[in-house]
Amino acid sequence: MINKLGLNVATLTILSTGWVFANSTADLDDIKLYDIVKVEQCLDQAYDRVPGHARKLEFKIEGDDPFYEFDIESSKDGFIYNVECNAEEGYITEIEKEVDQNNSLFKSEAKITIDQARVKVLSIHPGKIMNEEREIGMDGSFTYEFDVQTNAGYEIKIDVDAKSGEIEEASFELYEIGMEKE
């Protein structure tokens, strides 16, 4: 009963945003209806926190809040940082450093494997994993992040806590400009 109630609440939350994600060809012109700050305002804030070069921009919805997420290649250490900015208020909400599978700090802190996280994500959102990352948050968190093109036709970004195995957040990606570094 609780699982059904949770599923129904989650479904109503998604539907109440007014977005239809089941069809990947849905008209995204409704983005203009959001009262959001200019992307440049958020990018300026991101550069203040992580000086470097923006390599990618995503616009996504978490719950009913719009966010810009920048991938910035740091001019200080060469790492890629994911910098998230609330698009309604224009402030930075999260900074994460991308690391590879050999990062000793990540390996020592992770209690679940990326394979276990992958299985959990695909059991909830069946589809094809388009990208996966290991991230260390500036708040001390350790996360596996997956971009999934679901069988239902929408793209979703899912963060799994590498210590607990719990899903931290899921967001619908509305657009992406730029590419992941290969």
Task: Put a short name on every predicted segment.
Residues 2-12, 16-182:
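Long, terminal "pre-/pro-" and other extracytoplasmic accessory regions
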